[in-house]
């Protein structure tokens, strides 16, 4: 049986209740369809699906919905017993699905899943590490400049590659003008950071990224080695100057790699960040405010279902 958990407020679903109805019709007698907007609701659904013994967990929504679903389901299932996960997309940001090569409309993907499960057909599985951030599970973590970039991206309702280019241009102009936007984008954070138990030498940083997928959102692909080793995530940390950071952001968007002597680039299984002052962090595109201590570790490996067309 298939267990579908849907976020009715996902970006491409809100205001379109007919989409939810279509998904329910496609699922039909092949499983259970549940809606959740909070982590507590997700936990209740996880408990139900575990008791029912579902064979496939289908998640309808974007990166934020996936992050909340895994944060609820992984503890309930004990981390290692989670069934294969089918990403139905449907959110404003679908970075993880895109990284895994999952494309198409939510309805089309669910039809393929139902067809494959119904005839007990074989399907391709893509195994991907999760990243545990304190008590949450996701795939992308950011602190400093990555958070500033997201905040600028979320300022209005427009989305897409043109919006990303517009944000980068705003960054470049701020570097020239040295105004308030400059300080907002490049305000450093002070912290003691440990990677694999080793304390990094600095205390002032402009950016920290941890990821288990090669794209970290908005078209940026700085973590190309993120999936190189099971049980590890790629860790990028730097105290680059604002000018160097802005130029590197442009390089990454153009498909080039990060450069600079002041860049720490490692594969790690754990990291601890002790912040001098509360700072905002992001997990899979969602911003969490006023963090003081952040513990990162490689989480369980998820088997993602990639049904064939």
Identify the meaning behind each predicted range.
Residues 195-202, 221-309:
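ATP/nucleoside-binding phosphotransfer catalytic cores, i.e., glycine-rich phosphate-binding loops
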Residues 142, 146, 209-224, 287:
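Glycine-rich phosphate/pyrophosphate-binding beta-alpha loops
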Residues 6-9, 90, 238-240, 307:
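Cofactor-binding loop segments of dinucleotide-utilizing enzymes, especially the Rossmann-like FAD-
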Residues 36, 78-206:
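Catalytic core of DAGKc-family lipid kinases
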Residues 19-22, 74-75, 154-155, 224-227, ...:
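Short, solvent-exposed amphipathic alpha-helical segments in soluble enzyme
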Residues 14, 68-70, 96-98, 150, ...:
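Short glycine-/acidic-enriched loop or helix-start segments at secondary-structure transitions
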Residues 1-60, 65-71, 75-76, 110-111:
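ATP/NTP phosphate-donor binding region
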């Amino acid at each position: 049986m298939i267990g579908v958990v849907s976020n009715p407020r996902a970006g491409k679903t809100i205001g379109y209740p007919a989409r939810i109805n279509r998904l329910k019709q496609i699922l039909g007698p092949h499983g259970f369809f549940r809606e959740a907007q909070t982590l507590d609701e997700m936990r209740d659904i996880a408990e139900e699906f575990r008791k029912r013994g579902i064979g496939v967990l289908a998640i309808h929504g974007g990166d934020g919905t996936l992050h909340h679903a895994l944060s609820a389901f992984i503890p309930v299932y004990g981390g290692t017993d989670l069934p294969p996960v089918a990403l139905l997309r449907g959110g404003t940001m679908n970075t993880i699905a895109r990284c895994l090569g999952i494309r198409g409309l939510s309805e089309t993907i669910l039809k393929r899943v139902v067809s494959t499960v119904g005839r007990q057909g074989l399907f391709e599985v893509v195994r991907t590490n999760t990243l545990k951030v304190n008590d949450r599970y996701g795939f992308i973590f950011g602190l400093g400049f990555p958070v500033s970039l997201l905040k600028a991206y979320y300022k209005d309702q427009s989305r897409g590659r043109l919006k990303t280019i517009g944000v980068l241009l705003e960054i470049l102009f701020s570097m020239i003008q040295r105004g308030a936007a400059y300080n907002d984008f490049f305000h450093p954070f002070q912290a003691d950071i440990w990677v694999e138990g080793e304390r990094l030498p600095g205390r002032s940083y402009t950016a920290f990224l941890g990821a288990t997928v090669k794209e970290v959102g908005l078209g940026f692909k700085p973590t190309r080695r993120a999936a190189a080793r099971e049980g590890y995530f790629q860790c990028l940390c730097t105290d680059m100057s604002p000018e160097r950071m802005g130029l590197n952001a442009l390089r990454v968007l153009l498909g080039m790699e990060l450069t600079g002597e002041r860049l720490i680039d490692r594969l790690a299984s754990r990291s601890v960040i002790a912040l001098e002052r509360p700072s905002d962090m992001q997990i899979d595109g969602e911003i969490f405010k006023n963090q003081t201590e952040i513990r990162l570790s490689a989480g369980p490996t998820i088997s993602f279902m990639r049904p064939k067309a």
